[in-house]
């Protein structure tokens, strides 16, 4: 492609509202342009990268017998109502009405649509297993779109769905898809980790996220420093530890604590450590009130609470609800003397606490010497807190460390979550109707593009891995008024194209400095500069990743480039 004939609108300055490095560079290098908040156009270079990523995905899907199809982005409300998610998905689902008043949603995901299709078309176990996938735009009304393509309101996604007659078959496809995703992200040049994750609004169980490591990532990964264990911090398990010898229980004592509400204030007022305080939180799980307890220096993990209670929606009670249920205000709530109808769920660490401080369910008062086993009723103990750096790894090997990650893919075992709700059944060998077992597997195509940029850049611009680069070679003719340079550059351009290379030829009437700056910013793997030694048949070759440059005779250039490409391929 001749650069004079395409659209690559590079910028010299960093856009003021671009926070993430990938957002800055994709704007500056002319890959994307914002249309409105969270919505972007993919310019020609970005579109080529998107197609490269999609090609990798398609190749890996074909290896595991997944079949591509395409479903509508516009989905009728009735299908979502069948699954129940129309009422629980939340404001992220973009809803609209047509001129007849019928309700629709713009597809945030396609479980309902694919389940309805397979339900109507597949009736026998003989047609299973079946894996179908698509690549298309998705829509989510993000409250705060940010970081460019990393969190947008419209984005490109590959989503696959598998249907099975046995758990063993689902396990096999799940493992195949896990390996396929590993292959995809490896081929894209990403430094990533598969981590144990929560299924969230998707439902189901057994899920892994694929996290591209990056400081701009919005997810925290908890990993062992001595094993392969890795989990999203929401799902990292904290094992119950032996409390050891318990201290002698002291007499419960009510203490006047005027205007002392926070754990830090209570600890300072009583002259104790936050770890000697019980943090009490009144929460609502699908409208049902529960009291959740953690140690004062720990943070409650609402995902663990939600999963324990098998709730669709979990939220903190309002100040008015706290007053109605406990008779006090937030900051003075506690487990002692609470209405027996309110179930108490306490983190394992609370079980090991002796003579702790806790709210007295009375404004401006706390209890000292609280011992849960003696002083509270109707208590269930479970793992309810976020893991912390320095905690033992759940697999018993090493210590937990944290890293930030960008979620680029996720695989789920949905089980019968959707098939039962939507009556998607098949007839088994005995002619009995059985609900299909399902799996769901997603890759953020546009997010993967941004993740690649986050990991592959320097202060001059992008550095594209070979397999996803928009073009293999960048040929620069420094002076388009010099016949020798133009003729040699044209000759090389045609020869490399004829030999299967994807080439960008900078034939613009621009200064050499502009061409070099744009070339570094765009970041193609290999640059061939036709300059002052063109009349001698000598060109300069520069490797973008390493910065190495070589002067090569034009008649030796093809073999030299072949070797460089092989070298880049082996080190990608």
From Swiss-Prot:
Keyword Transport: no
GO terms under cellular component: cytosol
Keyword Nucleotide-binding: yes
Root EC class: ligase
One MF term in the entry's GO annotations: ATP binding
Signal peptide: none
InterPro entries linked: aa-tRNA-synt_IIb, aa-tRNA-synth_II, aa-tRNA-synth_II/BPL/LPL, Anticodon-bd, Anticodon-bd_dom_sf, Pro-tRNA-ligase_IIa, Pro-tRNA-synth_IIa_bac-type, Pro-tRNA-Synthase_IIa_type1
Subcellular location field: Cytoplasm
EC number: 6.1.1.15
Gene Ontology biological process: prolyl-tRNA aminoacylation
Highest taxon, organism lineage: Bacteria
The family this protein is said to belong to: Belongs to the class-II aminoacyl-tRNA synthetase family. ProS type 1 subfamily.
NCBIfam families named among the record's database cross-references: PRK09194.1, proS_fam_II
Written domain comment of the UniProt record: Consists of three domains: the N-terminal catalytic domain, the editing domain and the C-terminal anticodon-binding domain.
PANTHER family: MITOCHONDRIAL RIBOSOME PROTEIN L39/PROLYL-TRNA LIGASE FAMILY MEMBER, PROLINE--TRNA LIGASE
Role description: Catalyzes the attachment of proline to tRNA(Pro) in a two-step reaction: proline is first activated by ATP to form Pro-AMP and then transferred to the acceptor end of tRNA(Pro). As ProRS can inadvertently accommodate and process non-cognate amino acids such as alanine and cysteine, to avoid such errors it has two additional distinct editing activities against alanine. One activity is designated as 'pretransfer' editing and involves the tRNA(Pro)-independent hydrolysis of activated Ala-AMP.
Subunit field text: Homodimer.
The protein's name in its UniProt record: Proline--tRNA ligase
The encoding gene: proS
């Amino acid at each position: 492609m001749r650069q004079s004939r395409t659209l690559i609108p590079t910028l010299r300055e960093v856009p003021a509202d671009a926070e993430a490095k990938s957002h800055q560079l994709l704007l500056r290098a002319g890959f994307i342009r914002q249309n409105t908040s969270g919505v972007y156009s993919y310019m020609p270079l970005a579109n080529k990268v998107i197609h490269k990523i999609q090609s990798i995905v398609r190749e890996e899907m074909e290896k595991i017998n997944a079949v591509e199809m395409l479903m509508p982005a516009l989905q009728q409300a009735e299908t979502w109502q069948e699954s129940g998610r129309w009422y629980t998905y939340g404001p992220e689902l973009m809803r609209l009405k047509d001129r007849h008043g019928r309700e629709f949603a713009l597809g945030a995901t396609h479980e309902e649509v694919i389940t309805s299709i397979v339900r109507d078309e597949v009736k026998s176990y003989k047609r299973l297993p079946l894996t179908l996938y698509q690549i298309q735009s998705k829509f989510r009304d993000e409250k705060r779109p940010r970081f460019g393509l990393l969190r947008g309101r419209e984005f490109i996604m590959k989503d696959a769905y598998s249907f099975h007659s046995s758990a063993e078959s689902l396990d096999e496809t799940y493992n195949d898809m896990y390996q396929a995703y590993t292959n995809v992200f490896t081929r894209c040049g990403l430094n990533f980790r598969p981590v144990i994750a929560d299924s969230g609004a998707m439902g189901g169980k057994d899920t892994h996220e694929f996290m591209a490591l990056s400081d701009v990532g919005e997810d925290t990964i908890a990993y062992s420093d001595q094993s392969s264990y890795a989990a999203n911090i929401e799902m990292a398990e904290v094992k119950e530890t032996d409390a050891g010898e318990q201290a002698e229980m002291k007499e419960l004592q009510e203490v006047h604590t005027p205007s002392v509400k926070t754990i830090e204030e209570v600890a300072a007022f009583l002259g104790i450590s936050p770890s000697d305080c019980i943090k009490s939180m009144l929460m609502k799980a699908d409208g049902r009130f529960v009291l959740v307890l953690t140690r004062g220096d720990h943070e409650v993990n609402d995902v663990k609470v939600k999963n324990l209670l098998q709730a669709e929606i979990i939220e903190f009670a309002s100040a008015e609800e706290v007053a109605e249920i406990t008779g006090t205000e937030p900051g003075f709530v506690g487990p002692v003397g609470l209405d027996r109808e309110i179930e108490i769920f306490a983190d394992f660490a609370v079980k090991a606490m002796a003579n702790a401080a806790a709210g007295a369910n009375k404004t401006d008062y706390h209890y000292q010497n609280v011992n849960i086993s003696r002083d509270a009723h109707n208590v269930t103990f479970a793992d309810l807190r976020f893991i912390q750096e320095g905690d033992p790894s759940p697999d018993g090997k090493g210590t937990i460390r944290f890293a930030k990650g960008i979620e680029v893919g996720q695989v789920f075992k949905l089980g019968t979550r959707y098939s039962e709700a939507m009556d998607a059944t098949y007839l088994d060998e005995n002619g009995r109707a059985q609900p299909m077992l399902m799996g769901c597997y997603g890759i953020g195509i546009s997010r993967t593009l941004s993740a690649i940029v986050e990991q592959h850049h320097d202060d001059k611009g992008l550095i594209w891995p070979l397999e996803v680069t928009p073009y293999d070679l960048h040929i620069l003719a420094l002076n388009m008024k010099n016949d020798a340079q133009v003729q040699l550059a044209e000759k090389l351009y045609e020869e490399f194209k004829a030999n299967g290379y994807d080439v960008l030829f900078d034939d613009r009437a621009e200064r050499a400095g502009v061409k070099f700056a744009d070339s570094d910013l765009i970041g193609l793997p290999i640059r061939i500069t036709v300059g002052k030694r063109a009349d001698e048949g000598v060109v300069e070759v520069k490797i973008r990743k390493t910065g190495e440059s070589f002067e090569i005779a034009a008649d030796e250039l093809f073999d030299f480039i072949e070797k460089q490409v092989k070298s880049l391929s082996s080190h990608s």
